[in-house]
Amino acid sequence: MSEEAGEDAQRKAAEREAKKAEVRKRLEEAGNKKKAKKGFLTPERKKKLRKLLMVKAAEDLKRQQLLKEQERQKALADRTISLPNVDSIDDKGQLEKIYNDLWARLTQLEEEKYDINYVVSQTEAEINSLTIEVNDLRGKFVKPSLKKVSKYDNKFKKSGESKAGTKEDFRANLKIVKKDVMEAIVNVKKKDDKPDWSKKNKDAKAEDSAPAAVAPEAEPVAEEAEAEPEAEEEEGEEEEEE
């Protein structure tokens, strides 16, 4: 019985180990599949590749700059003439010859420059006309490049034109106020600005002068009363005459 129990235990242990090995193998296969899905360019490899590309681009740029500088120096050496030491030359004929040579060289270079500029302008005009034709065939419209103009430029131009011509009368736009109205406004302001004590004195003087002004008004009443009998007498005389 003990031998059978030992064999069962060994068999179970072997089965357990076999299952563990199978599970481990499955996990390894799954990990390998995930790694294979990521591809060759991992993030680390991408960083390294980017650095290498940047270094190579910088080296190429430096090489191109050196080549351009060498070509420039070579072109300048071919085009320029080595100038002689004029200070050490005393012969007038030799100096005139140097002057004539330099002048001829200058005129030649100016002619070449003019020819090159003419060719460039012609080619640019042809390119523009061809691009316009192509855009017309495609049905596209090329917007012209508009020049930005400041709003103050027009004002300055107008002011300059006005100064050059007739002078502007800025008072023409002002509101016209009559002289009488202005004097009335000034008088009202002066009256309002007077102190209170002057107003009190004026009120007292007005009260004193009020009775004196009433007294003379009684005389016309008496005169009217005297005039009424005279009118009646005249009417009576007219009746008698009739």
UniProtKB/Swiss-Prot annotation:
Q: Name one GO cellular component term.
A: troponin complex
According to UniProt, the tissues expressing it are described as:
Expressed in body-wall musculature, with weak expression in late-stage embryos and strong expression during the larval and adult stages. Also expressed in vulval and anal muscles, and weakly expressed in pharyngeal muscle.
Alphabetized Gene3D superfamilies for the sequence? 1.20.5.350
Basic and acidic residues biased stretches: 8-32, 190-208
Instruction: List the residue ranges of the region (Disordered).
Output: 1-41, 190-242
Q: Does the keyword Glycosyltransferase apply?
A: no
Entries under InterPro entries matching the protein: Troponin (IPR001978), Troponin_I (IPR050875), Troponin_sf (IPR038077)
List keywords of the entry alphabetically: Actin-binding, Muscle protein
Please give the biological process terms from Gene Ontology that the record holds: locomotion; muscle contraction; sarcomere organization
Give me the stretches of Acidic residues compositional bias: 220-242
A molecular function annotated in GO for this UniProt entry is: troponin C binding
Q: Where is the composition biased (Low complexity)?
A: 210-219
Q: What happens when the gene is disrupted?
A: Worms exhibit abnormal locomotion, unregulated contraction of the sarcomeres due to small portions of each myofibril shortening irregularly and independently from another causing rigid paralysis. This is due to poorly defined sarcomeric structure, with small islands of thin filaments interspersed within the overlap region of A bands and the H zone.
The answer on whether this UniProt entry bears the keyword Nucleotide-binding reads: no
Family per similarity comment: Belongs to the troponin I family.
Function (record text) = Troponin I is the inhibitory subunit of troponin, the thin filament regulatory complex which confers calcium-sensitivity to muscle actomyosin ATPase activity.
Q: What protein name applies here?
A: Troponin I 2
Kindly list the organism's lineage. Answer: Eukaryota, Metazoa, Ecdysozoa, Nematoda, Chromadorea
Q: Gene name?
A: unc-27
